[in-house]
């Protein structure tokens, strides 16, 4: 009898966790294979959220790499303008960069969602921690479902960049980015980076991310694919200034849970022993990067408890944060 109770509890706990699929093999066809593993029927017009890469950047996910998932879903690449100077700051310059980076080659469908800033609209954030609304581009309304395609790497402001960063800063319009960076103080990008605490900023990111997930879950569905390749401590926003990656390529992860997929990626980095690991972990800790995950989880859009399923072995590794070393322990142990 006791054996059956233990088995029941184990199965119940496993069912409460989100599935995160993983493969070590990074190629275009595996982007499709990983999406197929989710067994998710996305409805209507599918947006493929990407980072189009700042000028001079070498590490962003290239449109040629994403071609197969683009073809398979009959999707449209979607992106927004930025809240800092650079070629993605204005729609006209951003369109030039799209051409330079190949996003418009072969008649690829690529849309700048906030190309007309005057047409921005707001999404209400339920039970906000820091901000009660999210400002997004008008073309978001053109899409019924979405796959968020994220290059997992460090980030000089958020600590790291993954699915939740794409959902928050990535989906926000230029005014929305200023709103998040300032934790709800201003929509003016020139005033957005003045005196906001990291906890307030990362909390605002978690708030904003929740509104996008709820928006698509209430329409045609949403999925997430993180690619752990060229893992630099800097974001693709840094362009040519991004330092060389010091962490080896790890693989592709996919999930319907943005909290679980980002948590799984960070757990993999924690257990890594490459020379750049400690520097990235310290950055994430210093910039309160994990707070974004915590706030997103509080919103109920996902869980930090997950089952990591290695599709190369078809093995459920069954990992969760309770089994993992903390950031502080990892940094300490790495220095031993």
Model-derived regions: residue spans:
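Sec-dependent signal peptide recognition
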Residues: 1-7
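A general, composition-driven signal for non-globular sequence regions
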Residues: 7-10, 43
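Bacterial Sec-dependent signal peptides at the C-terminal "C-region" and cleavage site
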Residues: 9-18
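Extended, low-polarity segments enriched in aliphatic/aromatic residues
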Residues: 17-72, 76-336
């Amino acid at each position: 009898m006791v054996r059956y109770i233990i088995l029941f509890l184990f199965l119940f706990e496993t069912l409460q966790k989100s599935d995160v699929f993983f493969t070590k093999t990074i190629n275009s066809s595996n982007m499709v294979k990983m999406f197929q593993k989710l067994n998710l029927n996305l409805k209507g017009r599918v947006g493929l959220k990407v980072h189009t890469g700042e000028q001079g950047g070498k590490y962003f996910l290239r449109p040629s790499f994403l071609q197969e998932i683009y073809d398979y879903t009959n999707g449209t690449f979607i992106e927004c303008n930025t809240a800092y100077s650079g070629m993605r700051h204005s729609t006209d310059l951003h369109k030039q960069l799209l051409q330079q980076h190949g996003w418009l080659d072969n008649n690829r469908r690529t849309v700048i969602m906030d190309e007309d800033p005057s047409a921005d609209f707001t999404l209400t954030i339920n039970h906000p921690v820091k901000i009660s609304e999210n400002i997004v581009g008008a073309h978001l309304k053109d899409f019924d479902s979405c796959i968020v395609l994220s290059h997992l790497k460090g980030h000089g402001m958020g600590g790291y960049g993954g699915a939740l960063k794409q959902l928050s800063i990535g989906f926000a319009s230029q005014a929305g980015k200023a709103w998040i960076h300032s934790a709800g103080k201003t929509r003016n990008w020139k005033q957005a980076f003045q005196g906001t605490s990291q906890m307030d900023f990362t909390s605002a990111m978690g708030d904003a991310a929740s509104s996008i997930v709820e928006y698509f879950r209430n329409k045609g569905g949403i999925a997430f694919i993180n690619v752990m390749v060229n893992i630099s401590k800097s974001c693709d926003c840094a362009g040519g200034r991004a330092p060389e990656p010091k962490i080896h390529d790890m693989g592709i992860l996919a999930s319907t849970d943005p909290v679980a997929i980002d948590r799984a990626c960070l757990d993999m980095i924690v257990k890594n022993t490459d020379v750049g690991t400690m520097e990235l972990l310290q950055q994430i800790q210093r910039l309160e990067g994990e707070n974004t995950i915590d706030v997103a989880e509080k919103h109920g859009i996902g869980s930090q408890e997950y089952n990591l399923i290695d599709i190369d072995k078809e093995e459920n590794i069954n990992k969760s944060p309770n089994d993992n070393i903390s950031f502080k322990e990892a940094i300490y142990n790495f220095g031993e």
